[in-house]
């Protein structure tokens, strides 16, 4: 069957768009005749995995010049630009323009993009695998395969994407996964893991985990398709990335009471998508096998034979944050040898902890460990605005556009509300704030992250996660307005219900992160006085809503869904590396990597091949490192994620032993906040083969991390 060709632009770049009609023959089962005593099995046809929606599959080739796999044609320079890529017709962005915007925004969202912070010198499209500036603009030619994984209902529509670089060696095949971090779209981990895989010549298997940036504008019934373009929800049908499960009557009623609101896939799919993140990662790998066989299998008429069978390709499951947790879950669930090894950064993972697991630092038990996200995030969302006023948090980076006086007023009022509710004690704001910070310490937050409590809430990272995950775990409909929160557009004063001058839907695929506030869609609290930006809806920053979210955890409402996402830390002897910053204030290290190490050691014993590298002066968001106060105090975790990937590659290919678990004592850049000196290797000591007194130990489930 003839392939379909479409011209992308007047530049002369002509990517190939091959519809599934041209590939359907791969589902035909081949029969072969063998004679003369040939004992070889007959060739096997390359069959599209049953979970892939056949009509959704599409491929494109990028020439590595006008467009490419890593930078969407922007190159190192274009990615570094703070100016978003242009859209010719703002009222109707094309799929190619939205892809370019998504790659630009997602790349920048996970790494420090400043030259002094390391971009272009330690990482970036121009930096080769040895850390040298040899790759110019760093554009990478190759082919993309894009599809939905679904059960036939059209309600899952997990996006899977495979990038095969032109440098892929079919005789030495490799796959690197890049499961999206956060609730990002399918390109969410392109800088965190995809880039390294492409430079290594590996196919990269991406997935949005079924929680990626699908938005539904309820007032217009516009939804996004797999490529980010828009369509009416009814017309889109099963091709919609996400459509809220609402009847026409319910939708009309909700719109009349709460105009200009939005449903998001992670929050409102009512499927608890996190329970499937490991499976989604495995599906992405299976799709990569199919894509590689489609590209390199022997041509047999109109079909391709299977060249690569399950387990025959060196595959590293890699990503960060939620993508890191998904990678660990996938490795635990892998029963067919799809995953060879695991390398993850700052994994968000929820553990099924037995009593034998314990965590200590310097021989002293930590305040708490192994709590699930639903627990620690709802607590932090209540306490952080108040804790920000504690003397120990003075001088924290300021990460909000609100005036300083407004922020101080919110913090003071939050302290008063917490005290009135009996959550904290103290007769004045300073005492109350100190008590709030102490309560965070008691619940597993490191003193290393004291200066991050304020920016985690001010940036709205913590409120956004608290609301979205509560919705997801409660399997709440968008019409529930769980705890009186909703997602909507607001005016300059923060008032909700306003019709935006330009719909955020046009670019939500490119700019959105899947967790409002994002791309002009804000987190709204519907109070008795009216609906507004949650920070401004009440004097205390919508404390009633935050308290309600906390109660959903403490009263057991979320328990069933949280239990469904817990893992056992049994990696079945796969070599694995976890890297995390000690100062992480979004996913506290005491609730993630440290207890995972203990549980893994307990589960696997002597068979465990997990190494854990804890990095001092590193926190969760490398993209914040260009902000004043972050630059001078914190180092990039991404640097160590790259080192870990190189260490694992050497281990798999050369048998080089993985360095044991250890603390890496980094040196902050110092200097004036906002003008810190350039990052150098003096700030970034290496991961060492013999850590000595910096070794992290785990025995019988007990983890001890040296100070």
UniProtKB/Swiss-Prot annotation:
Catalytic activities: (3R)-hydroxybutanoate dimer + H2O = 2 (R)-3-hydroxybutanoate + H(+)
InterPro entries: OHBut_olig_hydro_put
Primary location class: secreted
EC supergroup of this enzyme: hydrolase
GO annotations of cellular component type: extracellular space
Cellular location(s): Secreted
EC number: 3.1.1.22
Keyword Hydrolase applies: yes
Cleavable signal peptide: 1-32
Annotated GO biological process: butyrate metabolic process
Keywords for the protein's UniProt record, in alphabetical order: Hydrolase, Secreted, Signal
GO MF annotation: an example: hydroxybutyrate-dimer hydrolase activity
Top-level taxon in the UniProt lineage: Bacteria
Active-site residue list: 321 (charge relay system)
Purpose of the protein: Participates in the degradation of poly-3-hydroxybutyrate (PHB). It works downstream of poly(3-hydroxybutyrate) depolymerase, hydrolyzing D(-)-3-hydroxybutyrate oligomers of various length (3HB-oligomers) into 3HB-monomers.
HAMAP family listed in its UniProt record: 3HBOH (MF_01906)
Recorded family membership: Belongs to the D-(-)-3-hydroxybutyrate oligomer hydrolase family.
Name the record gives this protein: D-(-)-3-hydroxybutyrate oligomer hydrolase
Species of origin: Paraburkholderia xenovorans (strain LB400)
Lineage of source species: Bacteria, Pseudomonadati, Pseudomonadota, Betaproteobacteria, Burkholderiales
């Amino acid at each position: 069957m003839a392939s379909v060709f479409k011209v992308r632009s007047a530049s002369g770049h002509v990517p190939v768009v091959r519809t599934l009609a041209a590939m359907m023959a791969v589902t035909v089962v081949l029969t072969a005749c063998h004679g003369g005593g040939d004992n070889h099995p007959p060739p096997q046809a390359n069959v599209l995995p049953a979970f892939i929606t056949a009509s959704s599959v599409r491929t494109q080739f990028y020439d590595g010049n006008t467009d490419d796999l890593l930078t969407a044609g922007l190159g190192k320079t274009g990615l570094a630009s703070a100016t978003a890529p242009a859209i010719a017709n703002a009222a109707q962005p094309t799929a190619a323009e939205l892809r370019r915007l998504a790659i630009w925004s997602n790349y920048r969202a996970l790494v420090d993009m400043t030259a002094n912070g390391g971009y272009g010198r330690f990482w970036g499209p121009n930096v080769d695998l040895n850390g040298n500036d040899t790759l110019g603009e760093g554009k990478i030619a190759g082919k993309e395969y894009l599809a939905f994984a679904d059960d036939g209902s059209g309600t899952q529509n997990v996006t899977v994407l495979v990038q095969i670089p032109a440098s892929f060696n079919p005789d030495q095949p490799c796959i690197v996964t890049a499961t999206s971090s956060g609730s990002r779209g399918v390109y969410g981990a392109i800088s965190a893991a995809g880039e390294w895989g492409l430079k290594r010549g590996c196919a990269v298997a991406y997935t949005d985990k079924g929680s990626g940036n699908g938005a539904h504008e309820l007032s217009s019934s516009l939804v996004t398709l797999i490529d980010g373009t828009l369509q009416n929800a009814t017309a889109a049908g099963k091709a919609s990335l996400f459509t809220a499960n609402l009847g026409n009557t319910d939708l009309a009623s909700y719109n009349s009471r709460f105009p200009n609101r939005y449903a998001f896939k992670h929050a409102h799919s009512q499927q608890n998508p996190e329970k499937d993140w490991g499976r989604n990662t495995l599906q992405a790998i299976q799709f990569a096998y199919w894509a590689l066989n489609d590209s390199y299998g022997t041509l047999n008429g109109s079909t391709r034979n299977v060249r690569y069978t399950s387990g025959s390709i060196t595959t590293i499951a890699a990503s960060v944050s939620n993508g890191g947790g998904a990678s660990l879950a996938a490795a635990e669930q892998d029963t067919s040898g799809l995953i060879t090894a695991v390398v993850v950064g700052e994994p968000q993972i929820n553990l099924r902890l037995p009593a034998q697991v314990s965590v200590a630092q310097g021989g002293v038990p930590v305040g708490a460990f192994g709590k699930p996200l639903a627990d620690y995030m709802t607590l932090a969302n209540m306490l952080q605005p108040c804790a920000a006023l504690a003397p120990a948090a003075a001088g924290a980076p300021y990460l909000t556009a609100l005036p300083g006086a407004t922020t101080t007023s919110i913090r003071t009022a939050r302290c008063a509300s917490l005290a009135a509710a009996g959550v904290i004690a103290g007769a004045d704001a300073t005492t109350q704030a100190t008590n709030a910070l102490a309560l965070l310490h008691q619940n597993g937050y490191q003193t290393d992250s004291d200066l991050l409590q304020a920016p985690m809430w001010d940036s709205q990272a913590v409120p956004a996660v608290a609301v979205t995950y509560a919705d997801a775990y409660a399997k709440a409909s968008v019409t529930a307005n769980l705890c009186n929160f909703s997602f909507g557009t607001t005016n300059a004063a923060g008032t909700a219900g306003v019709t935006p001058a330009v719909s955020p839907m046009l670019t939500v695929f490119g700019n959105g992160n899947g967790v409002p506030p994002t791309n002009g869609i804000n987190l709204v609290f519907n109070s008795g006085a009216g609906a507004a930006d949650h920070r401004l809806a009440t004097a205390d920053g919508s404390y009633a809503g935050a308290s309600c979210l906390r109660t959903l955890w403490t009263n057991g409402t979320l328990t069933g869904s949280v239990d469904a996402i817990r893992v056992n830390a049994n990696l079945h002897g796969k070599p694995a590396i976890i890297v995390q910053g000690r100062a992480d204030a979004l996913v506290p290290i005491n609730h993630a990597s440290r207890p995972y190490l203990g549980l893994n050691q307990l589960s696997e014993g002597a068979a465990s091949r997990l190494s854990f590298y804890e990095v001092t002066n590193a926190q969760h968001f490398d993209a914040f490192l260009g902000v004043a106060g972050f630059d001078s105090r914190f180092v990039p975790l991404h640097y160590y994620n790259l080192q870990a990937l190189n260490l694992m590659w050497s281990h798999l290919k050369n048998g080089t032993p993985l360095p044991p678990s250890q603390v890496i004592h980094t040196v902050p850049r110092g200097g004036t906040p906002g003008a810190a000196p350039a990052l150098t290797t003096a700030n970034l000591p290496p991961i060492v083969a013999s850590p000595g007194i910096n070794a992290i130990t785990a025995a019988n489930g007990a983890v001890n991390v040296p100070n």
